[in-house]
């Protein structure tokens, strides 16, 4: 469950390290986002010579949450932290690599590129 002001780590090689959620997209009164949801973020910490810099405002898709996601068989997939992958305006990933595991719930048409870049799909 990600809401405004939540700090997340970045799971790609775009150059950002830590980002903060500034808006949950998908409705005017929407408060929480989960795995697979698109959020608006601002970059709080970035590496030098990266593709993005501190202060940039971008979109991101959530790929891991501490809250986890419930599967239809009743199992819950949880992670140690909250992580996202940065997107450009066309909702394509900015980075060319994705670090860490990604859940199967991201397997919708929009994010198949992220699934193909991921080293492990749970």
Swiss-Prot record:
<protein>
    <recommendedName>
        <fullName>Large ribosomal subunit protein uL14</fullName>
    </recommendedName>
</protein>
<comment type="subunit">
    <text>Part of the 50S ribosomal subunit. Forms a cluster with proteins L3 and L19. In the 70S ribosome, L14 and L19 interact and together make contacts with the 16S rRNA in bridges B5 and B8.</text>
</comment>
<keyword id="KW-0694">RNA-binding</keyword>
<comment type="function">
    <text>Binds to 23S rRNA. Forms part of two intersubunit bridges in the 70S ribosome.</text>
</comment>
<dbReference type="GO" id="GO:0006412">
    <property type="term" value="P:translation"/>
</dbReference>
<keyword id="KW-0689">Ribosomal protein</keyword>
<dbReference type="GO" id="GO:0003735">
    <property type="term" value="F:structural constituent of ribosome"/>
</dbReference>
<dbReference type="InterPro" id="IPR005745">
    <property type="entry name" value="Ribosomal_uL14_bac-type"/>
</dbReference>
<dbReference type="InterPro" id="IPR036853">
    <property type="entry name" value="Ribosomal_uL14_sf"/>
</dbReference>
<comment type="similarity">
    <text>Belongs to the universal ribosomal protein uL14 family.</text>
</comment>
<dbReference type="Pfam" id="PF00238">
    <property type="entry name" value="Ribosomal_L14"/>
</dbReference>
<keyword id="KW-0687">Ribonucleoprotein</keyword>
<dbReference type="InterPro" id="IPR019972">
    <property type="entry name" value="Ribosomal_uL14_CS"/>
</dbReference>
<dbReference type="GO" id="GO:0022625">
    <property type="term" value="C:cytosolic large ribosomal subunit"/>
</dbReference>
<dbReference type="GO" id="GO:0070180">
    <property type="term" value="F:large ribosomal subunit rRNA binding"/>
</dbReference>
<keyword id="KW-0699">rRNA-binding</keyword>
<dbReference type="InterPro" id="IPR000218">
    <property type="entry name" value="Ribosomal_uL14"/>
</dbReference>
